[in-house]
Amino acid sequence: MSKGRLFTSESVTEGHPDKICDAISDSVLDSLLAQDPRSRVAVETLVTTGQVHVVGEVTTSAKEAFADITNTVRHRILEVGYDSSDKGFDGTTCGVNIGIGAQSPDIAQGVDTAHETRVEGAGDPLDLQGAGDQGLMFGYAIKDTPELMPLPIALAHRLARRLTEVRKNGVLDYLRPDGKTQVTVQYDGVTPVRLDTVVLSTQHAEGIDLEGTLTPDIREKVVNTVLSDLNHDSMDTSDFRLLVNPTGKFVLGGPMGDAGLTGRKIIVDTYGGWARHGGGAFSGKDPSKVDRSAAYAMRWVAKNVVAAGLADRVEVQVAYAIGKAAPVGLFVETFGTETVDPAKIEKAITEVFDLRPGAIVRDLDLLRPIYAPTAAYGHFGRTDIDLPWERTDKADALKTAV
């Protein structure tokens, strides 16, 4: 990485149209898992002016929750803050269309009875559950922040959460739910040295003065508050460019301003572009889908490797074949920051972590309604909620294994 490089990451608030869709999909998932932890769920949502469309495939015994999906959708929209057409959407009056079928039996056979059991005669119960699809998933951790996340995305998420907080608690009661944040950081090598630019766009009520009210309020109540809590050793935050609503007024927002879809913010959901991404979205998918559960497991692996002091930053990749339990590949990259032989790190990972889908679900206790809170502000590095894949409970075992 060259000296003086600028790297940028973005986040969005829970009122962004795509994030409304993620929230609805995960709220439906949680409602079904709460009644039937073995529910198979793949739910996609689309929102546009005055309408919500929820489609996908579900196999579940949670009949009450399934029958109540429309109310689940409305409740989540209202919880986000869209309760009036003046804000661009109203969860009470919008149209809600449900088009959900059953999971394909061709897929189910490979998940319910993995290749290892069907063909190879394996007797281990954890060989019974196969991967719900082929695919590759990445996990990453770095010593940039206490939560071991890249600094640009961590800061962008904190700004987005604070933007929502001042709206909901009435500190800036003229704000509306839709909003985006973007952070550009200057690096010396891989060390963040200076905050260069913060871009913040937020929906607001009609008649708010951009220069006289919105910009100073955002600087004082959002940006300065977040930076005062950041306390980063190497990054200078004393002189940065702040751009608030660079287009001018932002009154028309939410689904009235832009249509939204589940799964369109996968870089926001992960590492802000700093690490690679396998391409699979998370929201609306139960943990039999390795797009979600294995990406969580890879973050768990990466964070524990760094927490164990085996490397200052690490990226791990896992890959699966549909219907097979065992991964078909594992790749570990330590970028020259390792403190022991990388081959020993990879071997330790395979000894300490069982990466079969059934084991991931067991070890991270994923058959629970824990997903709706992850739908906005990132799935990784969260400091506001307790997520099992963020724990560093395997660090000592990794140290012993190497």
UniProtKB/Swiss-Prot annotation:
Cystine residue pairs: none
The EC number(s) this enzyme carries: 2.5.1.6
Cofactor needs: Mg(2+); K(+)
Residue ranges of the region described as Flexible loop: 103-113
List of residues binding K(+): E44
Keywords on record: ATP-binding, Cytoplasm, Magnesium, Metal-binding, Nucleotide-binding, One-carbon metabolism, Potassium, Transferase
Chain positions recorded as L-methionine binding sites: E57, Q103, D258, K289
Annotated ATP binding sites: H16, D178, G179, K180, K249, F250, D258, R264, K265, A281, K285
GO biological process, one term: one-carbon metabolic process
Reactions accelerated catalytically: L-methionine + ATP + H2O = S-adenosyl-L-methionine + phosphate + diphosphate
GO MF terms, alphabetically ordered: ATP binding; magnesium ion binding; methionine adenosyltransferase activity
Record's keyword annotation contains Nucleotide-binding: yes
Binding residue positions for Mg(2+): D18
Subcellular location field: Cytoplasm
Keyword Cytoplasm carried by entry: yes
Free-text comment on the cofactor: Binds 2 divalent ions per subunit. Binds 1 potassium ion per subunit.
Gene3D superfamilies named among the record's database cross-references: 3.30.300.10
Entry's Gene Ontology cellular component terms: cytoplasm
InterPro entries: ADOMET_SYNTHASE_CS, S-AdoMet_synt_C, S-AdoMet_synt_central, S-AdoMet_synt_N, S-AdoMet_synthetase, S-AdoMet_synthetase_sfam
Metabolic or biological pathway: Amino-acid biosynthesis; S-adenosyl-L-methionine biosynthesis; S-adenosyl-L-methionine from L-methionine: step 1/1
Subunit structure: Homotetramer; dimer of dimers.
Function noted in UniProt: Catalyzes the formation of S-adenosylmethionine (AdoMet) from methionine and ATP. The overall synthetic reaction is composed of two sequential steps, AdoMet formation and the subsequent tripolyphosphate hydrolysis which occurs prior to release of AdoMet from the enzyme.
Family affiliation: Belongs to the AdoMet synthase family.
Protein name (database record): S-adenosylmethionine synthase
Organism classification: Bacteria, Bacillati, Actinomycetota, Actinomycetes, Mycobacteriales
